[in-house]
Amino acid sequence: METSMETVIKKAEILIEALPYIQKLYGKTVVIKYGGNAMINEELKTSVMEDITLLKYIGMNPVVVHGGGPDINKALDKFNIKSRFINGLRLTDKATMDVAQMVLVGKTNKEIVSILNQMGGKAVGICGIDGNVIECEQYKTTIDGQETDLGYVGKITNINSKLIELLAKDEYIPVIAPIGIGKDGQSYNINADTVAGEIAAALKAEKLMLLTDVPGVKKNKDSDEIIPALTSAEALELINKKIIDGGMIPKVLGCIEALEKGVGRTHIIDGRIPHCLLLEIFTNKGIGTMIMKEKILYYEGEKL
């Protein structure tokens, strides 16, 4: 009986720990980039959707930007279309673009919307073509000293955030597929991390949350210990020291750019951990790496 009562008291303490964060974030926008293993594993998918629904119910304005690489790969295999990647970006010809748009907008987006709605949320699925939310141009990159394009891969030129704001500040949860629209009316596939960062900046979001398949930024290459909080300057120093490397570099640089454009805090968290969003947002220590312009506490009990 005593053990049972201790458990109940512990649960109450956890709820009280969340109180200052709920107070700080009430009415604020939180942009969540949903991707990685959390999109594949059904239990993780459920826990992320529960977290997002709860954020809305306690007064925050969650905005979801999703990837869909695994779904796209499955569809391309069905159509016998082979994928090629250059510098981590999918080389997207017309056939690949048609499949990517069909999958991201018609399948992945609607599945997320459906799950959120089943949990009591009011999710609305859109892509960047709707209301010209994501305006873009063809992305160019340099390969062997020569500028080249990657087909129908887009570079964002403007975010028209009014539609997202109208939905998020009302009772709805916007769920956004990373397809943009060019001046010529052509649709383009855009990296979901990039879309999430630009939307967070346009909305002046309090938080940008990137769900990944890694625990966060490690103290060094030989350590499993995660750095809970970094300033932008400290993160850049770790890149220069090659402690942050590989696929983590564009994620960290995207976080820093979002901070420069007005986002309050950015987070790189492990989407493989159940209820990762709640654990990162509402606990003093968090579970991943938070990147800020400066280390400013939300309240005195916060541990950075």
Curated annotation (Swiss-Prot):
Key words, A-Z: Amino-acid biosynthesis, Arginine biosynthesis, ATP-binding, Cytoplasm, Kinase, Nucleotide-binding, Transferase
One GO molecular-function entry: acetylglutamate kinase activity
Catalytic activity from the UniProt record: N-acetyl-L-glutamate + ATP = N-acetyl-L-glutamyl 5-phosphate + ADP
GO terms of biological process kind: arginine biosynthetic process via ornithine; L-arginine biosynthetic process
Subcellular location: Cytoplasm
Superkingdom: Bacteria
InterPro entries, alphabetized: AceGlu_kinase-like_sf, AcgluKinase_fam, ArgB, Asp/Glu/Uridylate_kinase, Glu/AcGlu_kinase, NAGK-C
Gene3D superfamilies: Acetylglutamate kinase-like
GO CC annotation terms, alphabetical: cytoplasm
Matches recorded under Pfam families: AA_kinase
Pathway(s) of this molecule: Amino-acid biosynthesis; L-arginine biosynthesis; N(2)-acetyl-L-ornithine from L-glutamate: step 2/4
Binding site for substrate: 68-69, 90, 189
Site feature: Transition state stabilizer: 33, 251
Documented EC number(s): 2.7.2.8
Family under the similarity heading: Belongs to the acetylglutamate kinase family. ArgB subfamily.
Function, in words: Catalyzes the ATP-dependent phosphorylation of N-acetyl-L-glutamate.
NCBIfam families xrefs: argB
Protein name: Acetylglutamate kinase
Species this protein is from: Acetivibrio thermocellus (strain ATCC 27405 / DSM 1237 / JCM 9322 / NBRC 103400 / NCIMB 10682 / NRRL B-4536 / VPI 7372) (Clostridium thermocellum)
